[in-house]
């Protein structure tokens, strides 16, 4: 039986972003996989050493080698080239769970990426304000945009 209890409140977090990219949907989807995996980095350009196993149940994690790292989530759904969905704690070392979705559609040579990150749990205030979370996802989507356009023009 606990000797003391602290009041804990369950909070939510939501980030939604839309990106329109002048590149075919297949190229954009492949670029998302690369940017979520081996090319993932902080907004300051530091590698996050991420691995993404692109199949249902595949892991998404930071690989520090020698059997060390940080589990971020599992691939909940993957339907190339239109959907990537991941669930797990992501970057939070707190009792929380996240769902991240990339939904892609293509029309007239433009791929539209609808991004959504939703989380629920004991999320600390420094994450709930959304500043750093928005900065991180915004940076990743910018890298996806730039890399997909470069790839398409090559």
Model-derived segments and spans:
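A solvent-exposed, acidic/Ser-Thr-rich amphipathic alpha-helical stretch
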Residues: 25, 45-58, 71
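Short, contiguous alpha-helical
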Residues: 33-37, 44-45, 107, 112, ...
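Hydrophobic-ligand binding "helix-grip"
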Residues: 50-51, 61, 65-109, 118-121, ...
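A conserved amphipathic terminal alpha-helix motif
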Residues: 119-154
């Amino acid at each position: 039986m606990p000797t003391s209890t602290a009041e804990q409140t369950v909070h939510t977090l939501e980030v939604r972003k839309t990106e329109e990219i002048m590149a075919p949907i297949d190229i954009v989807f492949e670029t998302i996989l690369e940017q979520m995996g081996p090319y993932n980095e902080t907004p300051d350009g530091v590698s996050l050493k991420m691995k993404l196993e692109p199949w249902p149940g595949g892991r998404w994690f930071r690989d520090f080698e020698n059997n060390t790292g940080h589990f971020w989530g599992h691939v909940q759904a993957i339907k190339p080239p239109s959907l990537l969905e991941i669930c797990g704690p992501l970057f939070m070392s707190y009792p929380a769970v996240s769902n991240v979705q990339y939904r892609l559609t293509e029309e007239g040579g433009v791929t539209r990426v609808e991004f959504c990150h939703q989380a629920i749990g004991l999320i600390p205030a420094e994450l709930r304000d959304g500043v750093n979370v928005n900065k991180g996802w915004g940076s990743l989507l910018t890298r996806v945009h730039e890399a997909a356009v470069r790839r398409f023009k090559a």
